Amino acid sequence: MKVVHTIQDLRDHLRGQNRVAFVPTMGNLHEGHLALMKLARQHGDPVVTSIFVNRLQFGPNEDFDRYPRTLPDDVAKMERDRDVYLVFAPDEREMYPEPQNYRVLPPDDLGDILEGEFRPGFFTGVCTVVMKLLACVQPRVAVFGKKDYQQLMVVRNMCRQLQLPVEILAHETVRADDGLALSSRNRYLSEAERAEAPVLYETLRGIAQRRAGGEQDPAALERVAAQALADRGWKVDYVAVRRQRDLKAPDVAEMSAGEPLVALAAAKLGATRLIDNLEF
């Protein structure tokens, strides 16, 4: 496995390759990331991973400065699993050698809802860096996790509408034994918070169970779930029941007709903001 830090070195190593599979990350890798790399290896060769903490997708009061930078540990994990051929680990100057005045803006009806409402500009930052990384790597396939459900949809729609020659593959959310979705930010949790954290996923499962039990009002499903979290001390940003196909709210007819849905939630446990989702 090789590690490169410049776009030129990246392109030199990939010259002539036309089956590249790509996994973009911000580093601080866990088993969820490594699962994406295993899926990438099934769909392309060589596998390229990027490690870059992208300032553009962090808001002014978010955790850009304290986000863990763990490149040596990340490299060791990838070397252990032997799924990755090339790691692209640029610094900020390499990715943004001048002010990034040209940016990729997702449509308001997808980019400004849910995560976009509570993290203004987040998806513009995501789309811009993903577009740049795809231009650098030029993969045939790229793999994203379903844990970031809205991000997956934004990126997939961007690539389709801009006719980028890349297939976006999705990997199911990887979870700990108690159901907590693996996340680089889980390390911020105290011992007591870590014990409480699986409740977020349990709450989403409760939404699916109530719908299966006959509840057809999405607002009622959202309200009960959000209140249950708040009663346990969570600070809830949103609990939303949406259509899987476009993240729009379902109407009553769609609820009764069995429309495929997804429940999405974001809430703070102490100082740590967690997100999760469940298709049903």
From Swiss-Prot:
The gene is panC. Homodimer. Its EC number is 6.3.2.1. InterPro entries: Cyt_trans-like, Pantoate_ligase, Pantoate_ligase_C, Rossmann-like_a/b/a_fold. The reaction proceeds by a bi uni uni bi ping pong mechanism. It catalyses: (R)-pantoate + beta-alanine + ATP = (R)-pantothenate + AMP + diphosphate + H(+). Keywords: ATP-binding, Cytoplasm, Ligase, Nucleotide-binding, Pantothenate biosynthesis. One of its GO terms (biological process) is pantothenate biosynthetic process. Its main location: cytoplasm. One of its GO terms (cellular component) is cytosol. SUPFAM superfamilies: Nucleotidylyl transferase (SSF52374). It comes from the Bacteria. Catalyzes the condensation of pantoate with beta-alanine in an ATP-dependent reaction via a pantoyl-adenylate intermediate. This is Pantothenate synthetase. Pathway: Cofactor biosynthesis; (R)-pantothenate biosynthesis; (R)-pantothenate from (R)-pantoate and beta-alanine: step 1/1. ATP binds at residues 26-33, 145-148, 174, 182-185. It is found in: Cytoplasm. Belongs to the pantothenate synthetase family. GO terms for molecular function: ATP binding; pantoate-beta-alanine ligase activity. Pfam families: Pantoate_ligase. The active site is at residue 33. Beta-alanine binds at residue 57. (R)-pantoate binds at residues 57, 151.
